[in-house]
Regions:
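Active-site-proximal helix/loop capping residues that flank conserved catalytic or ligand/cofactor
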Residues: 13-16, 42, 80
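Non-transmembrane, interaction-prone segments in cytosolic or luminal domains
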Residues: 3, 7, 66-69, 80
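Active-site metal-coordination/substrate-binding segment of hydrolases
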Residues: 77-105
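A non-catalytic alpha/beta surface segment that caps or lines the substrate-entry region
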Residues: 20-77, 101-104
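N-terminal hydrophobic or amphipathic helices/low-complexity stretches enriched
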Residues: 1-31, 35, 92-96
Length: 105
């Protein structure tokens, strides 16, 4: 796999783009708007094409994503697990925010 330089400003733009999705979950799954998660998944696919090209993607439930990065088995390195979550809590009272929720500011 070729090496890439990480630009901190581009990384910040990617993060700001990611937090613009109101991926609010609910204990009652019927109240969760999964179209927001679908849009977020599309954003990830467009923003990180190499991840989607080189890693195997498994959808674990209505919104869960599991990426499998297969090693060569030659290095003897221990397995590595990276985890994150996509859901957020409801924004509450927007008047209490310095910047609008989901603005990516």
């Amino acid at each position: 796999m070729e090496k890439h330089t990480i630009d901190p400003m581009v990384s910040a733009e990617h993060l700001a783009g990611a937090v613009r999705f109101a991926t609010v979950s609910n204990a009652d799954n019927s109240l969760t708007d999964y179209t927001k998660f679908d849009a977020f998944h599309e954003y990830l696919k467009e923003t990180y094409p190499l991840v989607h090209k080189h890693l195997a993607l498994e959808h674990t439930d209505q919104a869960g994503l599991l990426f499998h990065w297969k090693g060569t088995g030659k290095s003897g390195a221990a397995p590595l697990l990276l985890m994150a979550h996509q859901d957020v809590v409801p924004e509450g009272d927007p008047e209490k925010w310095t910047y609008p929720p989901y603005s990516g500011t």
